[in-house]
């Protein structure tokens, strides 16, 4: 049973979500139970945007610049894979905190620009890599830091997500989808993130 979090001295975090496909999971989760309030949605998919906007009763935008003018504290990026870094930079510069789906950036230059913008604005940026927060990875972190498994000197990570052809087509329709053209070695967050989270180290 989920208990409602008490926020007696804290105001709700007003959140806007860009992307009404994958982003719907974030829109649903941004509620008062976790001290958040969904206030705006943004997408170029007008039909779906209108449908989801009506469901949640929030403002909708097809223009990202206008979306950023909305009165909100944070932006959740669930748009296209290769768009995250430039969209995050714009949101940070607009005074918004940012949580971004993976990947954070697709080039080193984008990564540098993103880090510099975070430092310049002082706003919070979070990469929403979800796999470290599964129950078994949480337990592995506990075991590692408690010393119950001894001293760890080497670790590797691998992630496999078996899916039926029907499910693959459902989440990755057509050759223009990023999963169809992106080299698999570019998307290794589920393999590396748990290791980094469990050990508090950076892979080499």
What is each of the regions a protein language model found here?
Residues 56-117:
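Beta-loop-alpha module in the N-terminal Rossmann-like domain of NAD(P)-dependent dehydrogenases
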Residues 113-130, 150-154:
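Rossmann-fold dehydrogenase core element
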Residues 1-56:
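N-terminal Rossmann-like dinucleotide-binding module
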Residues 21, 131-204:
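Predominantly a Rossmann-like dinucleotide-binding segment in NAD(P)-dependent oxidoreductases
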Residues 40, 74, 154:
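Short, Asp-centered acidic motifs that coordinate Mg2+ and/or phosphate
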